[in-house]
Structures are given as C-alpha cells and as structure tokens.
C-alpha cells in the first residue's frame, strides 16, 4: 500500500518528473560520453531528430538537469557545464544572442549590434566553463531564407569552435537536410534518429515501464490487443503515449480499480481531436 493519499499520488502522476525509458537512456548515454571527452578545439556533437512529440525536448531537459549550474563561493564563480536554449522562431542571430544572455541571467538592455551581443555572450560562456551547448527546436531555422539558414548554422559552428564545446541540436525530421547543408557542421554532428513507436517488443517495454512508474497497487496485465490499441490511438508519438497512460492511471486510482485494464484502454477517449494532429511519415531508411 502507498503511504501517499490518492490525491497525492494523482498529483505526482500529473507532475513533470522524469520517467526513464530505453530510447531516452541511449541518447543520454551518448550525450554523457560527449561531456566526458577531453576538451579539444573541434569537439564532436550530435543532432537528435524525429517527429514532433517524440521526446526530444524531454531528453534535452533531462540532460541539462544532470549537470546543473554550480556556484563556487570561494572563487566567486558560477560554472554551467551545459546550456540549453531554444532556437528563435526564425534564424535571427541578434535574438539568439539575446536569448542566451537572458537565459544565463546577463541580459543586455537597449540597442546593441550583433557583434556586441556576441562578444558579451562569449565572454560569459567562457567564464562559465561551458562544455555543451544544446539548441532545441533547431527546425525553426527553416522559417528563414536559405541565406539566413546558412548564416545561423555558421554562427552555431563558430560558437562551438570558440568555446571548445560540443554542439547538440534537437529538431524535427525536416531540419535534417538544412543542417546537412552546412558541410563543416554536418561533419561534426553525428545523427541520432528517434522513430515513431511500432508494434514490437520495444513498445511493449515502454508501456511496462510507464505503468510501473504510475505505482498502482494492482498489476496491470494488458493484452497484446490493448498494446496495439494504445499504439493506434497515440500514433506512436511518445508524448501522447505518456498522456494516455497517465490518464488511465489516474482513472484507475479515482475509481479504486488500482490497475489499468483492457476495458479501460478500449474505452479511453483521447484528449486531442482527430483533426488536430497529423503524424508525419517516417523518413527514408537512409536517415535511420
């Protein structure tokens, strides 16, 4: 029996806490390996790509949380091993530098040239002993012209070179070719593809992992048919799988069932409407 009340258990399920699963662990291990590499002038990096909702941002936030900012009172210095920032809505260098400065708590007010923002950002990042720069939503660069995309990617490469830091970018499938368009950057970034979930053992393990994390008091022995229903309803998108399992677990607690049943899976109604989401096709096998 749980020591928490039903309300406390439900609040915990609804909370934004990390639930480890195999695919995410593989990416995190790759990122950890980059962090543990000796610093050099041209650090290797990684591009993690896949459909929207597949878990990229979740993984990025988890990685950043493993290397939190630390303040050394004796030295009066702040060390930030990893900086996670979101790409601006369009490939805009000024906005990107402003966002970096705001994220690290050093905003520059008033009008400044891109060069001034760049110098200030680099100065702070060097002082923070940055080892990895992670850019989420890198596909936002597609909102710009070809020339703007090239300039933005060149800026990212310059930052990584100047700081001797690993560059890690996260984006949807469509961003892959844009990043590959910068030959020098593409050679530095290994690629890790996160596909949609399929009807296989890996998906079964994911569901088992998620249900176990819900800490229900009874065992949920779902049939293969139920697993396929979950896959069909969610379209194989990680975020929707999480939403569905969490919703079913909350229902199980509220009703006193304390387990997710086949009947509950079949009866579950998605919180998204059928016309509100489109699952893109998997990229060609060559991208895997």
Segments from the language model and where they lie:
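Pre-Walker A adenine-sensing motif
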Residues: 28-40
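The catalytic "switch" region of P-loop NTPases
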Residues: 142-144, 152-225
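C-terminal alpha-helical "lid" subdomain
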Residues: 2-6, 11, 20, 53, ...
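A short hydrophobic beta-strand->loop->alpha-helix junction that borders the nucleotide-binding pocket
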Residues: 78-91
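Walker A/P-loop nucleotide-binding motif
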Residues: 40-62
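Post-Walker A helix-loop "phosphate-sensing" segment adjacent to the P-loop in P-loop NTPases
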Residues: 65-76, 106
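Mid-core helix/loop region of P-loop NTP-binding domains shared across ATPases and GTPases
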Residues: 2-5, 28, 92-96, 107-155, ...
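The feature captures the helix immediately C-terminal to the Walker
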Residues: 61-65, 242
């Amino acid at each position: 029996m749980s020591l928490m009340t039903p309300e406390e258990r439900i609040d915990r399920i609804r909370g934004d806490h990390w639930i480890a699963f195999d695919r995410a662990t593989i990416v995190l291990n790759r990122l950890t390996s980059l962090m543990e590499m000796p610093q050099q002038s041209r650090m290797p990096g990684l591009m993690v790509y896949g459909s929207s909702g597949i878990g990229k941002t979740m993984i990025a936030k988890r990685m950043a949380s493993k290397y939190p900012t630390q303040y050394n009172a004796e030295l009066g210095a702040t060390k930030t091993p990893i900086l996670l920032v979101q790409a601006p809505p369009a490939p805009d260098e000024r906005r990107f530098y402003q966002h970096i400065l705001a994220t690290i708590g050093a905003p520059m007010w008033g009008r400044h040239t891109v060069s001034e923002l760049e110098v200030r950002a680099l100065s702070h990042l060097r002082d923070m002993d940055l080892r990895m720069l992670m850019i989420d939503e890198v596909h936002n660069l597609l909102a710009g012209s070809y020339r703007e995309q090239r300039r933005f990617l060149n800026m990212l490469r310059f930052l990584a070179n100047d700081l001797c830091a690993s560059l890690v970018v996260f984006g949807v499938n469509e961003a892959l070719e844009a990043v590959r368009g910068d030959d020098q950057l593409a050679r530095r970034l290994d690629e890790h593809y996160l596909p949609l979930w399929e009807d296989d053992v890996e998906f079964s393990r994911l569901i088992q992992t998620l249900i176990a994390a819900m800490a229900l008091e009874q065992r949920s022995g779902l049939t293969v048919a139920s697993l396929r229903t979950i896959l069909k309803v969610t379209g194989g998108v990680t975020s929707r799988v999480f939403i569905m399992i969490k919703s079913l677990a909350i229902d199980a607690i509220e009703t006193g069932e304390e387990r997710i049943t086949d009947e509950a899976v079949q009866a579950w109604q998605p919180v998204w409407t059928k016309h509100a989401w489109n699952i893109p096709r998997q990229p060609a096998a060559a991208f895997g």
